[in-house]
UniProtKB/Swiss-Prot annotation:
PROSITE patterns: CBM10, GH11_1, GH11_3. The active site is at 152 (charge relay system), 555 (nucleophile), 648 (proton donor). It catalyses: Deacetylation of xylans and xylo-oligosaccharides; Endohydrolysis of (1->4)-beta-D-xylosidic linkages in xylans. One of its GO terms (biological process) is xylan catabolic process. Glycans are attached at residues 238, 339, 445, 483. It is found in: Secreted. Pathway: Glycan degradation; xylan degradation. Keywords: Carbohydrate metabolism, Glycoprotein, Glycosidase, Hydrolase, Polysaccharide degradation, Repeat, Secreted, Signal, Xylan degradation. It comes from Neocallimastix patriciarum (Rumen fungus). This is Bifunctional acetylxylan esterase/xylanase XynS20E. In the N-terminal section; belongs to the axeA family. In the C-terminal section; belongs to the glycosyl hydrolase 11 (cellulase G) family.
Amino acid sequence: MRLGVALSTIAVLLTATSARNLDKRQWGWPNFGGGNGGNGGNGGKTINDYKREQGAGRDIHVYAPSNLAPNSPLLLSLHGMDQDPNYQQSNTHWETLADSEGFVVVYPRGGTGMSTWDIQGTKDTQWVSQIIDQMKKEYNIDTKRVYLSGFSMGGMFTYHAMSQIANKIAAFAPCSGPNVFGASKAQRPVPIFHVHGTNDDVLNYQQVEGFLKNYRDQFHCPSQADTKTNYPNRENPNATLYTWGPCDKGVYIKHLKLQGRGHSPSSADIQDIWDFVSQWTVDGPVSASGNGGGNTTPTNPSTGGNGNGNGGGNTTPTNPSTGGNGNGNGGSTDKCSSNITKQGYKCCASNCEVVYTDSDGDWGVENDQWCGCGNRVTVGSGTCSAKILQQGYKCCPSGCIIYYTDEDGTWGVNGEEWCGCGSGSSSTGGGNDAPSSGSGYQGANGTNFCNNAKHSGESVTVTSNKVGDINGIGYELWADSGNNSATFYDDGSFSCSFQRAKDYLCRSGLSFDSTKTHKQIGHIYAEFKLVKQNIQNVDYSYVGIYGWTRNPLVEFYVVDNWLSQWRPGDWVGNKKHGDFTIGGAQYTVYENTRYGPSIDGDTNFKQYFSIRQQPRDCGTIDITAHFEQWEKLGMTMGKMHEAKVLGEAGSNNGGTSGTADFPFAKVYVKN
């Protein structure tokens, strides 16, 4: 009998004293606390705020925020053995996050045996799949952003679901419940966030490493974890977060170790879980897949929209309490009138400007107010398409600029067009965000390189690793394997071709003599246009600016795009400084110390990264602005050795192939 097999297997796993019976206490019966994390009831709604439904034959408790947007995510939270949805809800309170983050929560009821889960067969995976379909019909959820988290036996089922319905679940967060079948194979590499307490006397903590290793091996994750001690879990100051990745398909496995926690669900973990799972869709990271809030940008990039929508789906300012993110651009602070506040709009934070009024001066687009806290603009004409007018939007008056971003840098605001009729534009230099497909973006010399980029001048084709120079333009091709080549032109443009390379890079730009700092050289900018062709099997990638300094020895990256399907993440550096507005766009800054090959041989050196939050294929990079931001953070720059436009791609398995063409690439200095 299937249930008997499953329960006997579970009994073996419990602890060194697992000969004891599977009583209710061991499985988190409501009176069982275990450790210091059991109550979880820090406010929030009660089960009476939920809608109780019959979900494909068994009841489910559903919570949906009153202002739920279309294409919002779904999270399913599963109780432990011999428990019920009421107990799971009263300990986790997922609805408190659902209100602020905008997603649907479902608490299903277990139905196999003693309110347990079928962790070996298909009965309950089919039922969960039917619940997802039901939520699509009732709430129009985004079926690519469905997340599964379960406690105890619900956690065991969460692992089991990886082998059955990974095509319907984007990310998995088991809590205090390992996979009882150990090496059960997942249908695909999936993101995993496992939470477990060290004082768990039901499912012993010492078993966790072995269970997680099965999946790390399956997904070909790095053997060593990035370890963060004193991780700030809400209830546990002594938590430790372990991160393995990137693994196959760019996924990560994370484990939150809670010192002293027993065998209990807790609301203290839900923010950590949500922050992880919400980064993913079934197709990969949210930022790479384009799924995410249902934003619809105007369809004609040249006449009123960029067409680069990232699916961020933000409909409120980054900081709802102040209306701004604090990264002010130094502009004037617009005062809020009572007419604005009584309508429920937020005032701008200090040092932020109101730039997102429409052309007739109303706040937002007839409804919303937005604050601009980074002077992030897109240079383009104010012409209007019929498509824009049909949606009821205003055209920008003559002399105004279209602003396509909200304050946190995401493209579009639910498809709305914005006009900036004040400050904020310049057609030269850095700080302007050019649209990837171009709407007349002008480079430093007045060239419309986003639309008209093409290679010109003398060229040299390289088919093996080489550092060289062509009429004053420095270049390099390097690869560790495969059949690779690159063509470099003396106008700075270049084209990179790689076949079956484990790691490949090519770059072109300025070389220096390591005698002057960037301040002594002058203000450094770069302009680039990227065209991707037939890119395959890329696990990690950087497109942007690359270079070195000496004294101190620093390898630096400004990453504006990537050839992989996902944005470079926390794995690039062991110190994350945070998110900053640099040159008019949002970047995440990392710092790292490593030993390895460098321009001075194998030695210790620093690595600095700025990773753009939204990729672009064309634009101007204010390199000096990144140097200055790094220095504010205590990241010392040395004497400049080089600054070049970079295309780099790598694969953890099988090699990567494709072409990254840069028909326009230029690094230059303005004094």
